């Protein structure tokens, strides 16, 4: 008799995706982050659903409803901090996942990579709108500053901003629509993640060597389910340490003050996971130029498959490109630090150098390194 998981229409889909899936035998712990991102999404949707039961998207009561969740709702403080820190965890896993994709040349799978970039944009939009909902000082001013950037778009900019705001400033209409979008987008992200997986399973996983692994495959279960389980245990240990011992470590103290349109905070800045892009935005004195650079800082990932010059896919045996990759990682960390600093010397010039370096490494230095390494193969 045939096993039920191989015949039942629904179980057959799960079986092909997570049980009998042929996987390369040599993929390392860096391949864990896909499943960890799935876990983060489940945590966010679940905790967000319970928060939405008590939250009111109204300028007069939003802040007090969040306070009510933390003080009066049973384990409300835990749900709220799990949701807030879950976003940080999501982005940590997301950036590591992208970093692994760049290092091992996973961007060669064009469809999977492009869906991944779309997922990154959707996640950033969701996180931004979620940050506005508690209606604290940094929520309000962050929303005002970031949405105002759209006014830099020629001709339609001002109309577009007022259309998004639902008025002439960030107000009740803005909060309401941001809540609606913040609620629906995670489900769209979940659907897109399914498409991401669908495209990945068309080609099969990449591996650290960057060479075809058709001759040496092993079933996903039990080998990689147990490996993923170890990643989940470690991630949860880190997550609950953050939530239970340092819940406000990654937040902004300004968000514990209710939103006040008449009082601007001295340093308006987004959450830590957007600081690198925010630093790139601020490093260009022109508003439109800054907005273009901001979008390109993420969209540049879509160019990677087209500017790949090396004959080897992975960076595992390419020392020059390895050096440039870690220089890029250091540069992104430097930009993250700069994004949280005030706009004054020496931070301005450091930010400008780091921003230039970010684009130069990806667009100029890495393709040149690939050509040099091709020549080295002949020596």
UniProtKB/Swiss-Prot annotation:
UniProt entry tagged with the keyword Ribosomal protein: no
**One GO cellular component from the entry?**
mitochondrial inner membrane
Membrane topology listed for this record: Multi-pass membrane protein
Q: Where does heme b b566 bind?
A: 97, 196
GO molecular function, a single term: ubiquinol-cytochrome-c reductase activity
Q: How is the cofactor bound?
A: Binds 2 heme b groups non-covalently.
Q: What is its main location?
A: mitochondrion
Remarks, anything else? Heme 1 (or BL or b562) is low-potential and absorbs at about 562 nm, and heme 2 (or BH or b566) is high-potential and absorbs at about 566 nm.
Q: What is this protein called?
A: Cytochrome b
**Higher taxonomy:** Eukaryota, Metazoa, Chordata, Craniata, Vertebrata
């Amino acid at each position: 008799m045939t096993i039920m998981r191989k015949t039942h229409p629904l179980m057959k889909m799960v079986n092909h995706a997570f049980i009998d899936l042929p996987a390369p035998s040599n993929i390392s712990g860096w391949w864990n982050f896909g499943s960890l991102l799935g876990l983060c999404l489940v945590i966010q949707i679940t905790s967000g659903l319970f928060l939405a039961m008590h939250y009111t998207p109204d300028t007069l009561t939003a802040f007090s409803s969040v306070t009510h969740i933390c003080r009066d709702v049973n384990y409300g403080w835990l749900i709220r901090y799990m949701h807030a820190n879950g976003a940080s965890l999501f982005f940590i896993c997301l950036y590591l996942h992208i970093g692994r994709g760049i290092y091992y040349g996973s961007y060669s799978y064009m469809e999977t990579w492009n869906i991944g970039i779309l997922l990154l944009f959707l996640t950033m939009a969701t996180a931004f709108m979620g940050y506005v909902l508690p209606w604290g000082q940094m929520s309000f001013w962050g929303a005002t500053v970031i949405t105002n950037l759209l006014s830099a778009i020629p001709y339609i900019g001002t109309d577009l901003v007022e259309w998004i705001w639902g008025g002439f400033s960030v107000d009740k209409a803005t909060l309401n629509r941001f809540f609606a979008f913040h609620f629906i987008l995670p489900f769209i992200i979940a659907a897109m993640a399914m498409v991401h997986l669908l495209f990945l399973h068309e080609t099969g996983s990449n591996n650290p060597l960057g060479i075809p692994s058709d001759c040496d495959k092993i079933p996903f279960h039990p080998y990689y389910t147990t490996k993923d389980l170890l990643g989940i245990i470690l991630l949860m240990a880190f997550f609950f340490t953050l939530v239970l011992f340092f819940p406000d470590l990654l937040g902004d103290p300004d968000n514990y003050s209710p939103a006040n349109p008449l009082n601007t905070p001295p340093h308006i800045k987004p959450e830590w996971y957007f600081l690198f892009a925010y630093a790139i935005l601020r490093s260009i004195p022109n508003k439109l130029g800054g907005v273009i650079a901001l979008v390109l800082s993420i969209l540049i990932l879509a160019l990677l498959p087209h500017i790949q010059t090396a004959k080897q896919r992975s960076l595992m045996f390419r020392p020059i490109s390895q050096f440039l990759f870690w220089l890029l990682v250091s540069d992104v960390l430097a930009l993250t630090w700069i994004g949280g600093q005030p706009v004054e010397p020496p931070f301005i010039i450091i930010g400008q150098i780091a921003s230039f370096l970010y684009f130069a490494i990806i667009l100029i230095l890495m393709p040149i390194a690939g050509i040099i390494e091709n020549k080295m193969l002949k020596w």
